[in-house]
Amino acid sequence: MNFIFCTARCRRTVRQKPLVSLCVPVYGTEGLIGRFLDSILAQKDAPLFETIIVNDGSPGTKELRSIVKTYTKRFKERELPLVFLEHSKNLGTLEARRTAVNAASGEYLAFADPDDELTPAALRILYDAAATSGADIVHGKAAVCGMEDEPDARSASFAQKAQSVYEGVLTGGEILRKFIVEHSYSSFVWGKLFKTDLVQKAYSEIPFTYCTMAEDMLLYFFTALYADKYIGIPDTVYNYRINTGLTSRRQITDLAAWQKVCSASSVFTILFSYLNDHPAVGSDIREAVRDLGRAHYADNLKQLEICVVPSFQEEARAMLEEWWGIHN
């Protein structure tokens, strides 16, 4: 994997090492990242943090570089480190986040998408909760924006999941169980703060994988598996904009776009492989993973029927079956 540093970290002493690393993958959302970066610059009373932007081979690379160059000056004026990394080709959201995690120097890290925003006190609220509780996962609430343009049942269901937080403390095995078996809170990685070494450990279980769908669930499965303490808080820390990113349900007119949808199957290939190699994992968790796999496959079939143009429905179905293999 090739990437280059386009913006060096601002000089700082050991004492100025950032406490939080904000990891931001970018692909095709250059037109929206300015609003996101403004929300970062507007953070109030935040701990020292760095922002790591990963250009995942975006078709708008030239525009993105120009925007980052402009914002670099503003970040430097605030003495906020800004790091810009690039993949030479599109590797998918999971791998773009991995690149950011590997570059992170903060004790904690957070994920964000460039078409969303942080609320003004998000980083302070999340960090304070981590520091006072000792939790290695802090989960805040998200507000879902854009529902007025997407009033359908699917959007409403997504909004409900995005706002789902277990308000309280979980420890040990209950962290994973409450998420994957009881569905007590969401697995979206945005709106959360993590111990950096915890996420790095989670990534060590995940082989290189092209994945742009369900990647949050894959990463969070292993993060929750290894976490010692989770705390959910009532504060809204994230503004999610529905129907602006890769997960939006739009008409699919080529096989490259359809491949991104099918990539959800990679998540379950990895999870099933892990479960096969670790027989001690509880039967309730195994069944929950199987149920999620069935649900994602069913959703892919629905997308095939609704979103894929008729001219290549047959090819798209063959691709879907090839990606899912024995899991269909």
Q: What kind of feature is each model-predicted range?
A:
Residues 37-38, 65, 98, 106, ...:
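Short alpha-helix within the catalytic core of nucleotide-sugar-dependent glycosyltransferases
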Residues 1-42:
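N-proximal low-complexity "stem/linker" segments adjacent to membrane-targeting elements
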Residues 19-21, 50, 218:
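Cell-envelope/extracellular polymer assembly enzymes that use nucleotide-activated donors
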Residues 117-231, 240-258:
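Donor-binding/catalytic cores of nucleotide-activated saccharide
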Residues 37-86:
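Acidic donor-binding segment of Leloir-type glycosyltransferases
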Residues 109:
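Short aromatic/hydrophobic "clamp" motif used to bind/position activated sugar donors
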Residues 2-17, 213, 232, 236-328:
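C-terminal subregions of glycosyltransferases and related glycan-biosynthesis enzymes
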Residues 84-104:
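Glycine-rich, basic loop-to-helix element that forms the pyrophosphate-binding segment
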